[in-house]
Structures are given as structure tokens and as C-alpha cells.
Amino acid sequence: MISEARKPRPIKRHAAPALAAMLLIAAQGLHAAPPSGDVEFMNKAAQAGQMEIEASNLAQNKAGSGAVKRFAGQMLQDHRAAAADLKRLASAKGVQLPTTPSQDDKKKLEALGALNGASFDKQYASEVGVKAHNEAVALFRKASAEARDTDVREFARKTLPTLEHHLEMAKTMASEVSR
């Protein structure tokens, strides 16, 4: 007969694995992906930012205007910083971001890369400066108001004023290069 002290205790035997499972589930909950609309915003923001970085890299070599080169330099600095912030946010939320521009933006970059000097300047100012920033401002405004994840919403709110400033800078640059 088994003594009382040596009897197996089913509750203790199952408690450790059950506790481990509960902790694992709780930890996964801390890193749960944001709602699908917020993830879609993050993906679009990553792709748009990557397009602006790649286009601005092109501008450093192909632009003829000093204004375009200065604008592109500012875009590289600001969009790299925003991309790093977005990457940290995505990592914390367990979201895998795209690392390349969208297919449409890749086509625009290819067309832009075929240009030089004044023709490059006009196209860059129009497509990357004004049009892309109009789209980015709209995207970030919507996320600032509608994102359900508070961290995603805060990222959009924090980044929006910079994008609005870029849009104003782009309009000025576009008027300079269209003269």
C-alpha cells in the first residue's frame, strides 16, 4: 500500500502544465495583432514610405534642381525615421510589414528612374512630392481618427504633422520646378 505522503496528487501533477499554458495564452494576448483595418494601414504606410525613400534616393542622383535635392534629403531623413518607428510598432504588435513599395509604386519608380534633370524634377515634384503626400496625409488622417489600436492611432497622430509639412513643402517645390 502506498503511504499518504507518496500518493500521486493529480492536481499538482497537472497544475504546472496548465499554468504554463495559461501564461503562454496571456503572453500571446499581449502581442495580439491589431484589428485588420489597422494592419492594412500599417502595410500601406510601410509601402508608401518605402516608395518615398526609393524615389528620394533617385532624386539625390537624378535631380537637376537644388530645391528638389534638398526636399529629397529631408524626405530621406524623415521617412527613414518614420519607417523605423513603424517597424518598432509592428514588431511589438507581431505584424510583418512589407519591405518594398506596392506594384503600382514600383512602376512609378521605374518610370521616374528613366528621367534626368528638369524632366525628373517635374515628375518627382508632382508624383512623389504632391500626389504621394496628398495620399499619405489622407491615409494618416483616417488612421488618426479611426484606428482601433491605441498605439497604431498614436503613431498616425504623431506622424501626420510631418506629412502635412511635407505636402506644403512639396507644393512650393512643384511651383518652383514648373517655372
Region spans (language model):
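His/Met- and acidic-residue-enriched segments that coordinate or traffic transition-metal cofactors
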Residues: I2-A18, M22-R179
